[in-house]
Amino acid sequence: MTGTIRIIGIDPGLRRTGWAVIETVGNSLRFIGAGTVRSNDKADLASRLCQLHDGLAEILHLHMPQEAAVEATFVNKDAVATLKLGQARGIAMLVPARAGLRVAEYAPNAVKKAVIGVGHGEKRQIHMMVKVLMPKALFDGDDAADAIAVAICHAHHRQSPAWRLALEAQP
């Protein structure tokens, strides 16, 4: 596994889905771009999911990543909100999968642990460490910063023996 690998990290959300593209060569990381795909909260659910789909598809076409990582969603007390978030996450997984990318999933605490060293941290800690790890990173809010963290997490985990075995097992 040598050479440059371009990774897209995605932090799914129905209102705002964060995305970030980084490159990894060995242990070094390079920031490519980050941002947020927004859906119109006045539109119906199907239209909002289409907006997320089209926005992510455009990002993939523009940046041509080779691997994708999506943050797993959590279940909260509002079942309807959790279901909608799950649908947005489905779009976040579908778009790169349809583009032929392998899609890895990471729990929020795994992302935090990879970036700040502990599984339970605050948003400001993630922002601070993203800036330390990638000083040239520019992001327009929490969602894009979280997506950078997801991409960094994947860059670290993709070098693990378990990830290599998973890649070898797939055609």
From Swiss-Prot:
- Keyword Lipid metabolism among UniProt keywords: no
Question: Where is it localised?
Answer: Cytoplasm
Query: How is the cofactor bound, in the record's words?
Result: Binds 2 Mg(2+) ion per subunit.
Record: residues binding Mg(2+) 2: E71
Quick one: signal sequence residues? Answer: none
EC number in record: 3.1.21.10
Keyword field:
Cytoplasm, DNA damage, DNA recombination, DNA repair, DNA-binding, Endonuclease, Hydrolase, Magnesium, Metal-binding, Nuclease
Q: Where is the active site?
A: D11, E71, D143
UniProt xrefs under Gene3D superfamilies: Ribonuclease H-like superfamily/Ribonuclease H (3.30.420.10)
Q: What is its main location?
A: cytoplasm
Cofactor(s) recorded in Swiss-Prot or TrEMBL: Mg(2+)
Q: Which InterPro entries match?
A: RNaseH-like_sf, RNaseH_sf, X-over_junc_endoDNase_Mg_BS, X-over_junc_endoDNase_RuvC
Binding locations of Mg(2+) 1: D11, D143
Q: Name one GO cellular component term.
A: cytoplasm
Q: Which GO terms describe its biological process?
A: DNA recombination; DNA repair
Reactions the enzyme catalyzes: Endonucleolytic cleavage at a junction such as a reciprocal single-stranded crossover between two homologous DNA duplexes (Holliday junction)
Q: Entry's SUPFAM superfamilies?
A: Ribonuclease H-like (SSF53098)
* Alphabetized GO MF terms: crossover junction DNA endonuclease activity; DNA binding; magnesium ion binding
Question: What the protein does?
Answer: The RuvA-RuvB-RuvC complex processes Holliday junction (HJ) DNA during genetic recombination and DNA repair. Endonuclease that resolves HJ intermediates. Cleaves cruciform DNA by making single-stranded nicks across the HJ at symmetrical positions within the homologous arms, yielding a 5'-phosphate and a 3'-hydroxyl group; requires a central core of homology in the junction. The consensus cleavage sequence is 5'-(A/T)TT(C/G)-3'. Cleavage occurs on the 3'-side of the TT dinucleotide at the point of strand exchange.
Q: Which family does it belong to?
A: Belongs to the RuvC family.
Self-association and partners: Homodimer which binds Holliday junction (HJ) DNA. The HJ becomes 2-fold symmetrical on binding to RuvC with unstacked arms; it has a different conformation from HJ DNA in complex with RuvA. In the full resolvosome a probable DNA-RuvA(4)-RuvB(12)-RuvC(2) complex forms which resolves the HJ.
PANTHER family in the record = CROSSOVER JUNCTION ENDODEOXYRIBONUCLEASE RUVC
The protein's name: Crossover junction endodeoxyribonuclease RuvC
Species per Swiss-Prot/TrEMBL record: Chelativorans sp. (strain BNC1)
